[in-house]
Design a protein with these regions (language model features):
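C-terminal and inter-domain tail/linker signature
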Residues: 1-158
Length: 158
């Protein structure tokens, strides 16, 4: 396996799926920058070195203790690795102000990781966040949103 692919495989399989938080020290640079794109909205880049990544993973696991990632596709080219992932877990702890629902969620992510000096130096994450909130019941499903939109358009209200 190519070194860049190996690092991302460790990120998914060891850090997330095996809950080995110490792996963050081995695979993340101290000055790693994360760019999040959630349902079309680009957030501010965030510093996420090894310690911040451990806290990030721990936070998700407190809310979704059975959380797992499955790599569906991975493409590596020079210092970049693009992955298509499926994240699955059961909502058992408060997450982003949403009380535990007991609902099982499954969402897709696309990630791009830039590797420098054998560590993750930068990443871009596209999360299907609308689907996530819909699965938790925090927002109406897409069909209901479209019905509401159509009714509003028909009545002239926006």
């Amino acid at each position: 396996m190519e070194p860049a692919r190996y690092i991302i495989n460790r990120f998914v399989e060891e850090l997330w799926n095996a809950r080995r938080l110490d792996v963050a020290d081995q695979i993340f640079s101290e000055d790693c920058v994360t760019h999040q794109l959630r349902s079309g909205v680009l957030g501010e880049p965030a510093h996420r070195g090894p310690q911040e990544m451990k806290e990030h993973v721990s936070g998700w696991l407190m809310s979704f203790p059975d959380l797992r990632f499955n790599i569906e596709q991975m493409i590596a080219e020079r210092d970049r690795v693009v992955s298509q992932l499926v994240m699955e877990g059961t909502h058992q702890g408060t997450w982003m102000g949403i009380l535990p629902t007991g609902k099982r969620l499954q969402i897709r992510l696309i990630t791009i990781h830039r590797i420098a000096n054998g560590k993750i130096a930068e990443d871009w994450v596209l999360v299907e966040s609308l689907g996530l909130f819909q699965q938790l019941g925090a927002v109406p499903d897409t069909a209901e949103l479209m019905r509401n939109f159509a009714q509003g358009a028909d009545s002239g209200s926006h």
